[in-house]
Amino acid sequence: MSLTPQSNWQVWVGQLDLESDQCWQVAIGEKELHWHEFQDSFKCIAAAGGRVENEDDHILMIYRRDKWDLPKGKVDKGESIHQAAVREVMEECGLQYVERGVKLGVIYHMYFHKEKWVLKDTHWYKMRASKNEILIPQIEEDITAIEWVDPQTHPWKTNTFPSIEDVMSW
């Protein structure tokens, strides 16, 4: 499906296949002109998370809803994006101390929830934590396991989201 500057975003969004497992990538040529129009077709949610490394260069991954993922969550009212990233990592993994590093980038993804399309922008940060901390999965967020993984040898790639592969490569 292709889009032009004359496209009606809401019509385009309405034509997305809800049953499909496809990953959609949307490139907007004249970003300033069309981005707000595109966003208006969605309920927009800001989120933040971290690619957390330890002293062995292993990455902290969570297992949630049958997928390997990175810790992240919604930005609370009155909270900055970088504060949310640290808080979410600490809450979801039970960590007591996390050092926030540089911002890695932003990933946008769309999903259908409660009869409305949602556009979530997730801001990702590089972080560090100690491998000696006790990891406690946040069960109420459906996290069933947390592991420090060697990204080169652990089979996480066979069961994750395309966006997580992107963040892991940054």
What are these regions (language model features)?
Residues V52-E55, M127-A129:
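Active-site beta-strand termini and strand-to-loop segments that position acidic
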